[in-house]
Swiss-Prot record:
Pfam families hit by this protein: Chi-conotoxin
Species whose genome carries this gene: Conus textile
MF annotations from Gene Ontology: toxin activity
Range of residues in the leader sequence: 1-19
The protein's name in its UniProt record: Conotoxin Tx-D0111
Post-translational modification: Contains 2 disulfide bonds that can be either 'C1-C3, C2-C4' or 'C1-C4, C2-C3', since these disulfide connectivities have been observed for conotoxins with cysteine framework V (for examples, see AC P0DQQ7 and AC P81755).
Amino acid sequence: MRCLPVFVILLLLIASTPSDTVPLKTKDDMPQASFHGNARRTLQMLSKKQCCWYFDISCCITV
């Protein structure tokens, strides 16, 4: 029974220590634009261009 208070105190000390597994986020760590958003933007840009022939650049019309 004498070990029980020591065990409880150790558990409380372990629980109160800061965790190193989760890094703090800073402004520099924020994720950039997602790949999905970039792909969607590229597809929208390509869908706005209408070309009659791929080798005739003068025929291309950007709407």
